[in-house]
Swiss-Prot record:
This protein's name: Aspartate--tRNA(Asp/Asn) ligase
A biological-process GO annotation: aspartyl-tRNA aminoacylation
Annotated region (Aspartate), positions in chain: 206-209
Location relative to the cell: Cytoplasm
């Protein structure tokens, strides 16, 4: 059985001790990281969240304590009292901050014993993610995981600090809300008091933050828990955290400005990185045409170039058909990649097919010739113009796709990133932010045969496009903006509709009858009747931002207790079956 503290009080954290503490009597507490027995001396590295300190147990100092330490093993929890001593020069360990000192133990309490853990508690530990998630409390003892969660804490702390100083009020919104099935599936919570009725867990605080603006709070924020029952793609979680922000009496530039200043503050505070503001701005159209994506990674070039005008008269069927069907021909230049083998080029063609491309045309620019399956279909003039447009030099590889615009963009956008990774063109030390603005307000859903909101139904159209809402809905641009960091969207928002009539028109274009719109969003529509200010905001994916700031490979590494990709908690075994009694109370019958 473990000993009690018995009045012993910790004086220092393990990683905080240094030469300044030599001669002091200290009490440290933590876990045994490692143990080494050298006959008359036992060395223990004691670990807490601040780091490691070496403790020396010597027969000369205390025979009783020396005998007691013989039973101690890895991950035992100890309280140690002793004197801080400067190490001899030959024993200094430069790898750890406490490497110049050690503690000579005078008193030892074994607070808790440990079985041998299923994997070593160290960053080098080569263990499967499934085992790490099953024993998450052990995984979280590893220094890298503790650093990640402490960085995440510092991130939320810096966000709060900035927003508090800029007149924002933190307000919590409800977790049990009305289900409004638009977007992802809701998680439903049955009501025991009202049999047959259900609450939903919030996918975001969207409607409530708008109501807070109507209530006159002017500037709101919340570190909000959000839940979506969606089919999990790579690196999505059923529950996640948003930095949620809303402001009254603002236009797009006001929102972008305060967010740039917040991000600058956060990066300086957490990572000591100085960011230049304002960030770059790209319209949605420009981002698609230059980078093939609305989430462009600007740490490298390799921009898409439109070749359609050069090849308009081409006799090559692939080009002819693409242009005839309203598509385009575009290409990228991968500098210095002409040395790729035929096998590697064939793999690239297969890679391109994953994104709907029927094929991929490659050109190797060599000394005195251009090697490509397409050269025989091109005139010399066409070939020279392609080389000129793509700024080709000897040693370059040109990749060209001809298809519908969306296929061309998607394929070349992914190829651009793939080639940058293969040829190490990405400077991992850079943070490249960009605002993508002027998104289309609507998209057409072929399955449902109706228009759907690209962001959500409360996004305001640009003033100059309002008249197109019923006539040419797909031409309407939104007062919407996404913030992208190194090719990852970390946040997005919009100016909202604050006018009842415009909101009704929007619902109509989306195919909601007035009755249906009222049934889903009646309480918001009712609130609009009583004077709504112009308002807008943004929400950041906190997990994704923390992942980038810690250099982690997955958001699971910045969440204390994440679910797997199949939405399962391997540690607690959630979701699980519940008792018949619980189901009966809720008037629920399981029909599998």
């Amino acid at each position: 059985m473990g000993e009690q503290l018995g009045g012993l009080k910790r004086t220092h954290m393990c990683g905080e001790l240094g030469v300044k503490d030599v001669g002091k009597s200290v009490v440290v507490m933590g876990w045994v990281n490692s143990r080494r027995d050298h006959g008359g001396l036992v060395f223990i590295d004691l670990r807490d969240r601040t780091g490691i300190v070496q403790i020396v147990f010597s027969e000369q100092v205390s025979k009783e304590v020396f005998e007691k330490v013989q039973s101690v093993r890895s991950e035992y929890v100890l309280a140690v009292e002793g004197e801080v001593v400067k190490r001899l020069p030959e024993n200094v360990n430069p790898k750890i901050p406490t490497g110049e000192i050690e503690i000579y133990a005078k008193n030892l309490k074994i607070l808790s014993k440990s079985e041998t853990p299923p994997f070593p508690i160290e960053d080098r530990s080569n263990v499967s993610e499934a085992v790490r998630l099953k024993y998450r409390y052990l995984d979280l003892r590893r220094p890298s995981m503790q650093r990640n969660l402490i960085t995440r804490f510092k991130l939320t702390q810096a966000v709060r600090e900035f927003l508090n100083d800029n007149g924002f009020i933190e307000i919590e919104t409800p977790m049990l809300i009305k289900s409004t099935p638009e977007g992802a599936r809701d998680y439903l919570v049955p009501s025991r008091i009202y049999p047959g009725k259900f609450y939903a867990l919030p996918q975001s605080p969207q409607i409530f933050k708008q109501l807070l603006m109507i209530a006159g709070f002017d500037r709101y924020y919340q570190i909000a828990r959000c839940l979506r029952d969606e089919d999990l793609r790579a690196d999505r979680q059923p529950e996640f955290t948003q930095i949620d922000i809303e402001m009254s009496f603002v236009e797009v530039e006001d929102v972008l400005d305060i967010n740039e200043r917040m991000i600058k503050h956060v990066f300086k505070k957490v990572l000591d990185v100085d960011l230049d503001i304002p960030f770059r701005r790209l319209t949605y159209q420009e981002a698609m045409e230059r980078f093939g994506t609305d989430k462009p990674d600007l740490r490298f070039g390799m921009e898409l170039k439109d070749l359609s005008d050069i090849l308009r008269e081409s006799e090559f069927n692939v080009f002819k058909n693409a242009l005839k069907n309203g598509g385009s021909i575009r290409g990228i230049n991968v500098k210095g990649a002409a040395s790729m083998t035929r096998k590697q080029l064939d793999e690239l063609v297969e890679f391109a097919k994953n994104f709907g491309a029927k094929g991929l045309l490659w050109m190797q620019v060599l000394e005195g010739e251009v090697k490509s399956p397409a050269t025989k279909f091109l005139t010399e003039g066409e070939l020279n113009k392609i080389l000129e447009r793509l700024e080709a030099e000897v040693g370059d590889l040109l990749l060209i796709v001809a298809d519908k615009d969306e296929v061309v963009f998607d394929t070349l956008g992914h190829l651009r990133v793939e080639m940058a990774k293969r040829f190490n063109l990405i400077d991992e030390s850079k943070y490249e932010f960009v605002w993508v603005v002027d998104f289309p307000l609507l998209e057409y859903d072929e399955e449902e045969k109706r228009y759907v909101a690209k962001h959500h139904p409360f996004t305001s159209p640009k003033d100059e496009d309002i008249d197109l809402l019923e006539k040419e809905p797909l031409k309407v641009r939104a007062k919407a903006y996404d913030i992208v960091l190194n090719g990852t969207e970390i946040g997005g928002g919009s100016i909202r509709i604050h006018d009842t009539e415009l909101q009704k028109r929007m619902f109509k274009v989306l195919g909601f009858s007035e009755e249906e719109a009222w049934k889903k969003f009646g309480f918001l529509m009712e609130a609009f009747k009583y004077g709504a200010p112009p308002h807008g905001g943004i929400a950041y994916g906190l997990d994704r931002l923390a992942m980038i700031m810690t250099g982690s490979d997955t958001i699971r590494d910045v969440i204390a207790f994440p679910k797997t990709q199949n939405a399962v908690c391997l540690m607690s075994d959630a979701p699980s079956e519940v008792s018949e009694k619980q189901l009966k109370e809720l008037h629920i019958k399981i029909d599998l």
